[in-house]
């Protein structure tokens, strides 16, 4: 994914946030070298819990409705917007912690991965709050897809597969 950055990300500090269900992991890389690694307890399941509480769904119903984009009309204003703000602030705090605990004072790119990374407005809000160019990681970028692959679904879910693709690629990269 870093290879898709300008100049293939050479000499760039890349902050990779993998937003999981319960944990968000920050990894800062430069030229494929891991410089920093920290986890924080904040993830996509908090959004599902908010949906569940607000609308009276079970957790499982809330998750299914979230994935199917089958939520009440006020969802974006009442739940999604404030959640995107909170998640963006958590990302900003994690970066500030990185800056205060290392000699670095900036990153060149913020890359978002994990199922929650595709939330509408998240990339833009992170850029706005941090001042750093943000993007959603897509491990399938530039890859030729077979005819049986449902491209729209794959593109939508691509950030969720970043770790799996990285692990699979390790076998082929010397």
Regions of interest found by a model, annotated:
Residues 1-174:
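Hydrophobic/aromatic-enriched cytosolic interaction surfaces used to assemble or bind macromolecules
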């Amino acid at each position: 994914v870093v290879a898709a950055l300008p100049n293939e990300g050479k000499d760039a500090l890349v902050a990779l946030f993998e937003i999981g269900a319960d944990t968000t992991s920050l990894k800062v890389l430069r030229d494929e070298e891991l410089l920093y690694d920290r986890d924080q307890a904040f993830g996509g399941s908090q959004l599902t819990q908010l949906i569940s509480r607000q609308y009276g769904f079970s957790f499982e119903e809330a998750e299914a409705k979230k994935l199917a984009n089958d939520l009440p009309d006020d969802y974006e204003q009442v739940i999604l917007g404030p959640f995107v703000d909170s998640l963006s602030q958590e990302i900003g705090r994690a970066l500030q912690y990185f800056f205060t605990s290392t000699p670095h004072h900036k990153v060149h790119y913020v890359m978002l991965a994990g199922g929650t990374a595709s939330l509408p407005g998240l990339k833009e809000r992170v850029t706005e709050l941090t001042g750093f160019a943000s993007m959603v990681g897509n491990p399938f970028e530039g890859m030729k897809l077979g005819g049986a692959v449902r491209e729209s679904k794959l593109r939508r879910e691509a950030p969720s597969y970043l770790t799996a693709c990285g692990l699979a690629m390790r076998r082929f990269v010397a």
